[in-house]
Amino acid sequence: MAEPIQVAEEKMKKAIETLKEEFATIRAGRANPHILDKVMVDYYGVPTPIPQVASITVPEARMIVIQPWEARMLKEIEKAIQKSDLGVNPTNDGKVIRLIFPELTEERRKELVKQVKKMAEDAKVAIRNIRREALDEYKKMKKNNEITEDDLKDAEEDVQKLHDKYIEQIEKLLSAKEKEIMEV
């Protein structure tokens, strides 16, 4: 059986990965091809992410160009983007689809910062819950005489250090994302 601290670290890593994925979906006035990862198109009856049916390039800071591998997918991709909540209108020239991202207004930037702060807070709550689970597991082991009082104290310190390390990572990610959003 894995040590509670190892289980906790795995879960904390997953929480950080989830936060990074969520942050990637927030566009900060720059074209980010990852915003298309969750936009699905109908590909021969199967919902498929756009990156799996087209090549995606970012020729300019605020433009994404989508070139489908099959011409018939142009209309499908265009429809999927219009239905999505990306907030951009696709332009279809018959060969490629261009997405032009407008400059973000100050108000929109502040909304996005609020959104990323909430995401970061949710990640911190997850980390704290994981810490609590690990500590409870160690207390149970102590109660069952599987570990000594000293072992319990050491484990509590180690779990706290792990918690602090991941909370700090969240703070760094949040700070970088806020800076990216507020950059004009």
Curated annotation (Swiss-Prot):
One of its GO terms (cellular component) is cytoplasm. One of its GO terms (molecular function) is ribosomal large subunit binding. Keywords: Cytoplasm, Protein biosynthesis. It is found in: Cytoplasm. The keyword Cytoplasm applies. The keyword Phosphoprotein does not apply. Signal peptide: none annotated. GO terms for biological process: translational termination. Disulfide bonds: none annotated. InterPro entries: Ribosome_recyc_fac (IPR002661), Ribosome_recyc_fac_dom (IPR023584), RRF_sf (IPR036191). Gene3D superfamilies: 3.30.1360.40, Ribosome-recycling factor (1.10.132.20). Responsible for the release of ribosomes from messenger RNA at the termination of protein biosynthesis. May increase the efficiency of translation by recycling ribosomes from one round of translation to another. HAMAP family: RRF. Belongs to the RRF family. This is Ribosome-recycling factor. The lineage of its organism: Bacteria, Bacillati, Bacillota, Bacillota incertae sedis, Caldicellulosiruptorales.
